[in-house]
Amino acid sequence: MVLVTLLGLSWFCSPLAALVLDFNNIKSSADVQGAGKGSLCASDRDCSEGKFCLAFHDERSFCATCRRVRRRCQRSAVCCPGTVCVNDVCTAVEDTRPVMDRNTDGQDGAYAEGTTKWPAEENRPQGKPSTKKSQSSKGQEGESCLRTSDCGPGLCCARHFWTKICKPVLREGQVCSRRGHKDTAQAPEIFQRCDCGPGLTCRSQVTSNRQHSRLRVCQRI
């Protein structure tokens, strides 16, 4: 009789025990999923320190762990404490302070929210230096140049091998090159001369027998 009673109780309790185990498994899975995503949120203010409100297109927003230095970001709230979002990258505050201090004078709240942007001058690529010089800073003979306006009086900017330097304008009797003449083929010059000075022209030198030589010199017009 006792054996029959025990068998009956075990048969009755087995489904109940299985139901309790299934409920515990479901609860544990939900806890793990909730712990992985964090609590639901509507904005960053709903999350605790060190977290931000992360939103996906097809899921509800939840609190996610903040991102460390050199991680991608869309706003400063995404970055961990002590860092800010600069040019879409989490950056330590001490690395941005010189630029921020220099550009926030007289601009209250310029870096308060959103992504911190570097000034346009900081991001602008370094190009060629300005060639506008005052008269006192004009290039002297032998100094590098880009154009004749970079050189001082009586000088021109001419090619010297694979660079350009300031050279003296040619005087009367000096050998010259007649550049831009269509009748003769011109090869690339790696050693250019300046043009003849004012009142002079580059012409073939006349020899004693009044024949034109191949040598050209600066002569009076």
Swiss-Prot record:
Q: Can you supply one Gene Ontology CC term for this chain's record?
A: extracellular region
User: Does the keyword Transferase feature in the UniProt annotation?
Assistant: no
Q: What is this protein called?
A: Dickkopf-related protein 4
Q: What broad class describes the main subcellular location of this protein?
A: secreted
What organism is listed for this UniProt entry? Mus musculus
Enumerate the UniProt keywords alphabetically.
Developmental protein, Disulfide bond, Secreted, Signal, Wnt signaling pathway
* Family listed: Belongs to the dickkopf family.
* Subunit-structure text: Interacts with LRP5 and LRP6.
Q: Name one GO biological process term.
A: negative regulation of hair follicle placode formation
Q: Which domain of life is it from?
A: Eukaryota
